[in-house]
């Protein structure tokens, strides 16, 4: 009987061990099944952005004065068709890393963001043009600090400003005066980013100048750099940047200054404030401009966000704010050549005010439209000192309503 009892007990123990082993192996199988492979470092992506801006005044020159990327009144625009080839940096602690980015654009926005020497004279008479927006190598060195030093070599977009060339990073379809004329669009050269601490980044670079690349409009280099702060666990960020150097065609001595402070405050999970402070100075013309833009956005739900933006831009010397009526005139002005369209004009000595309100709609739709964003807006611009720069130089103010559609793929 004792032997039978022992055998029975052993049988129960073996059964329990067997079941436990199966459970363990089954658990391991589930873990292995659920483990996802790491995302590839090399990615191809892109987007399409198309929109229209309605101007009830229907100006004879077809221009929304002071506006670059939504400059055509009552005319649909293919703003951007963009494709990216990128290997982003993803450094491991103490290890060297490398990456690169090539971003190609075809669209009406390219007219204004060209750099001299890269597609700046290609399809110059067309409203839609090609451009190489960015083309650079990125190197990470695990030196000096815990997060090390990054070095960017090539052509890259500017550090400056709240708004960007990439429409997906902007709340509104239209841009501020600050973005259009108060900051550079791109640089070509070398830019170092030193991650001094978890909350402090230092930027320093040498470039060929503002919106230049293979060619330059003079023989001097420029400085581009600044300081970035990431505070309150990311709820407050401050980026103070500058670009300093000779930017006037055939002038290697007189300096141009583009200075900007961008402040982002996450007040609540749904409510965000952005502030853009700007100062520009051109020594050749002894001209300066000041700007301030304030944004507030509120996320109503997962797919709908409302926003408002107010701006004042002081162009008291009448040097900075222009409207380019010819598709190639922006590049002619950058090269120092005379513009050819009589309706490429400035607004005179004017202080501009603008207020914009709109929503961002990101409907929950299936692929291939899963990346759809719709940005309707209304905007009111005015001269605050009785000049008449708007609607074919006939009005003190200008009302527009715009909408664009972005599809990311």
Each model region followed by its residue ranges:
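Outer-membrane beta-barrel biogenesis signature
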Residues: 21-48, 53-70, 157-158, 162-165, ...
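Cleavable N-terminal export/targeting peptides
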Residues: 1-30
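Transmembrane beta-strands of outer-membrane beta-barrel proteins
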Residues: 42-50, 96-102, 149-153, 201-204, ...
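Transmembrane beta-barrel domains of bacterial outer-membrane proteins
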Residues: 37, 54-56, 66-70, 78-89, ...
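Residues on the lipid-exposed face of transmembrane beta-strands in outer-membrane beta-barrel proteins
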Residues: 46, 81-87, 134-139, 153, ...
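Outer-membrane beta-barrel pore domains
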Residues: 67-70, 110-113, 121-125, 236-246, ...
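Surface-exposed coil loops of outer-membrane beta-barrel proteins
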Residues: 57-73, 110-228, 237-246, 323, ...
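Short loop/turn motifs that connect adjacent beta-strands in outer-membrane beta-barrel proteins
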Residues: 27-44, 89-98, 142-149, 199, ...
């Amino acid at each position: 009987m004792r032997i039978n009892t022992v055998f029975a007990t052993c049988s129960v123990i073996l059964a329990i061990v067997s079941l436990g082993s199966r459970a363990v192996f089954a658990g391991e199988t589930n873990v292995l099944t659920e483990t996802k492979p790491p995302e590839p470092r090399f990615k191809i992506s892109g987007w399409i952005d198309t929109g229209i801006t309605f101007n009830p005044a229907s100006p004879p020159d077809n221009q929304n004065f002071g506006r670059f990327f939504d400059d055509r009144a009552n005319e649909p625009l293919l703003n951007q068709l963009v494709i990216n080839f990128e290997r982003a940096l993803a450094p491991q602690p103490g290890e060297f890393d490398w990456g690169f980015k090539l971003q190609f654009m075809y669209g009406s926005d390219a007219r204004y963001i060209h750099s001299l020497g890269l597609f700046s004279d290609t399809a110059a008479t067309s409203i839609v043009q090609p451009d190489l927006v960015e083309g650079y190598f990125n190197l990470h060195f695990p030196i000096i600090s815990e997060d090390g030093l990054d070095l960017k070599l090539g052509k890259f977009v500017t550090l400056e400003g709240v708004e960007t060339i990439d429409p997906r990073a902007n709340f509104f379809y239209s841009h501020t005066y600050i973005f259009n004329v108060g900051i550079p669009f791109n640089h070509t050269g070398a830019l170092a980013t030193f991650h001094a601490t978890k909350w402090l980044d230092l930027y320093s670079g040498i470039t060929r100048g503002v919106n230049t690349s293979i060619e330059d409009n003079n023989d001097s280099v420029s400085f581009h750099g600044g300081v970035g702060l990431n505070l309150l666990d990311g709820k407050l960020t401050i980026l103070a940047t500058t670009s300093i150097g000779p930017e006037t065609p055939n002038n290697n001595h007189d300096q141009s200054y583009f200075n900007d402070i961008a402040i982002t405050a996450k007040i609540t999970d749904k409510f965000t404030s952005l502030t853009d402070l700007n100062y520009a100075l051109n020594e050749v013309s002894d001209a300066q401009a000041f700007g301030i833009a304030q944004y507030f956005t509120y996320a109503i739900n997962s797919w709908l966000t409302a926003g408002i933006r107010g701006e004042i831009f002081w162009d008291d010397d009448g040097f900075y704010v222009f409207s380019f009526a010819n598709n190639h005139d922006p590049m002619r002005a950058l090269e120092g050549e005379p513009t050819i369209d009589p309706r490429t004009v400035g607004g005179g000595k004017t202080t501009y005010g603008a207020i914009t309100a709109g929503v961002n709609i990101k409907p929950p739709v299936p692929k291939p439209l899963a990346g759809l964003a719709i940005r309707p807006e209304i905007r009111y611009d005015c001269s605050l000192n009785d000049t008449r720069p708007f609607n074919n130089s006939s009005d003190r103010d200008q009302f527009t309503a715009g909408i664009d559609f972005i599809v990311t793929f």
